[in-house]
A protein has these predicted regions:
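Alpha-helix initiation/capping motif
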Residues: 5, 32-33, 75-77, 98, ...
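A short, well-structured juxtamembrane/interface segment
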Residues: 19-43, 55-57, 62
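Catalytic core of membrane glycerolipid acyltransferases/transacylases, capturing the structured
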Residues: 44-100, 161
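Structural signal for conserved beta-strand scaffold positions within catalytic alpha/beta enzyme cores
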Residues: 30, 72-74, 96, 151, ...
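Pocket-edge structural micro-motifs
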Residues: 30-32, 49-51, 74, 183, ...
Length: 214
């Protein structure tokens, strides 16, 4: 079904309405010991969250960053079309691309967005995994932009798990949702592949720390 057909537009409007109603039943709590939300008033960040927790990010970003525009990296696939529409309907921007399609162009657009003062969201193990292993793109963006990576995690009291490669989380209605922020991580220049891999693993471990401390 083409996304510009009347049937598609009707289904999208219905789906968005149901999504908003469902999201309003959830109870959100923020844990921000490093004062990231306060610091974000003065600088843009690269927010990083694992792919299997991304469903609630549009309302979460509206809740946590009402004062700063945010842009998300969304897969250029057909599945990504619907995600992009959802993100944009919540008032956020999108950059389309992935590691296998339009990748480098998308990453440079994210660098430009950060230079313009916009927060950037990257799911570093998406869109295909491996699960909980970050790809090189987020390190590239951090090095080129000079912006810090902020590990972010969403923990759900009650959720369904899909049979996808990442066992995607869908919170059940009325579930509690904890939004956790870790310490900002700067990534400097690297002299070669070994240093680059060291930085990649350091950022990966920072994200996993939030998962393990849930």
């Amino acid at each position: 079904m083409k996304l510009d057909s009347w049937r598609a537009r009707a289904l999208i409007a219905l789906g968005l309405g149901m999504f908003r109603l469902w999201a309003r039943t959830l109870r959100f709590g923020v844990e921000d010991p490093e004062k990231i939300l306060s610091a974000s008033r003065d600088q843009p960040f690269i927010l990083s969250v694992w792919h299997n927790r991304l469903l609630l990010l549009p309302p979460v970003f509206s809740l946590c960053f009402p004062h700063r525009r945010s842009v998300g990296l969304i897969s250029a696939s057909r599945d990504g079309d619907f995600v992009a529409i959802l993100v944009e309907r919540f008032g956020h921007g999108t950059v389309r691309g992935s590691s296998s399609r339009k990748g480098i162009i998308a990453l440079r657009q994210l660098v430009d967005a950060l230079a313009a003062g916009t927060n950037v969201l990257i799911t570093p193990d998406g869109p295909r995994g491996p699960l909980y292993e970050i790809n090189q793109g987020i390190i590239f963006v951090a090095q080129k932009s000079g912006a810090a990576i902020v590990p972010m995690h969403l923990e759900f009291a009650n959720a369904w798990r899909l049979k996808s490669w990442d066992r995607f989380f869908v919170p059940k209605p009325f579930s509690e949702v904890r939004i956790l922020f870790g310490a900002a991580q700067r990534v400097g220049p690297t002299a070669g592949p070994e240093e680059f891999e060291h930085e990649r693993l350091r950022i990966q471990n920072a994200l996993m720390k939030l998962v393990e401390e849930k």
